[in-house]
Amino acid sequence: MSSPLIYPGATVCEGVTFGAGCVVGTHVYVGKRCQLGESVRIQHGAFLCNDMVIGDRVFIGPLVVCTDDRWPKVNNPQYHAEPPMLEDDCNIGGGAILLPGVRIGHHATVGAGAVVTNDVAPYTVVVGCPAREMEREVV
C-alpha cells in the first residue's frame, strides 16, 4: 500500500487508514478511525467526522462537511455518533453538507452546496437544500 499524499495544513487523526493513491488537500480534517479506500481525493478545507467509511475512487470537493451528531452532545448522555458512509465511485460537490447517518450510494453525485438529509441511491444525482433527486430529461 502506498502512502497518501497529504498537503500542508491537513489534520489526519489517529487510527485513520488509507488505500493506495489517496490525496488529502490543504486544511482538510480527517477524524479518528476513518477508513478511506483507494484513490480517494479530498479537496481543500473538507471536514470528515470520526469513523467514516469511504469507498474507492471517491471525490470529496472543497469545504464539504460531514457531520455525525443529530443532537449536540453537550449535556446529552444519550449521544450516539452516526457518521455518513460514502460508497465506491461517488462524487460530493464543493460545499455540500452530509448529515448524520446518510449513505451515499455507489456512482451517486451530490451537487455543490447540497444539504443531504436522507440516503442517496446508487447512480442518483441530488441537488439543493434539502437535497432532492434531479429529474432526468428524456432526449
Where are these regions (language model features)?
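Glycine-centered loop/turn positions within well-structured domains
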Residues: 122-124, 132
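Conserved G/P- and acidic residue-centered "switch" motifs that form tight phosphate/ATP-binding loops
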Residues: 110, 128
